[in-house]
Amino acid sequence: MSSEFAGKLGNLGINEQINMGLRLGARYYLGFLLISLIVDIPLALAGVMGDKSSSSILSFFLGIPLIALINPISKVAIIIAIIDITNGVKPTFRRAYSVVFSRFGAVIAASALWLISVAVGVLVLVIPGLFLLIAGQCIMGVVVTENLKGVAAFRRSWELVKPKFWSVLTIFLFVEITPGLLSAPISLLLSNFLGGGNGVWITAIIERAWSSPFVYAILAVMFLDLQAKNKESGS
């Protein structure tokens, strides 16, 4: 699979990126799940705390801003894991996060820059916010694999996304919408089985975490394919 995947990078269409991501997510599911849980567990618990909180301000900050700020940590870790796979190296939690934490400050700074840019764009007008959201889809991968920071990383992300903007938008919508649709019946079953009380916390973790290996793998394949396309074009 590693040589097959590496050989196809730079030549994948939307369906192939999604298919390859799903295949990698399925094959390395437990490993990718372990990598993503380091972020998914606190985000799931924060979401429940936000829902239970009587403070609208606290609920807000435990929602989208927190997700946007720390979610990219797992996204980058899966990119590292898949790069290892393409090189014929077994992906591990330790290896993925050793690379991430070596660039941790730059990753968080890029997340904050992206979050602020999108928020400002949404406040000005919804369309600019959506544009910046898609333009920055490769920013985390660029920070770790190309050692760029801040604005330079954002510009490089746009350079990768620009030729395939609509493809990136399509994949973004796919990974945002599909897990939510599939999680609805899972959440219903878990709620009926576990009930309220402490069951709410367990349900939140499972509901958030089960799809992460597939979502992050698809986004990682998309980034690596766009990066390979860019190199092949000589940009």
Where are these regions (language model features)?
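Hydrophobic alpha-helical membrane segments
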Residues: 1-235
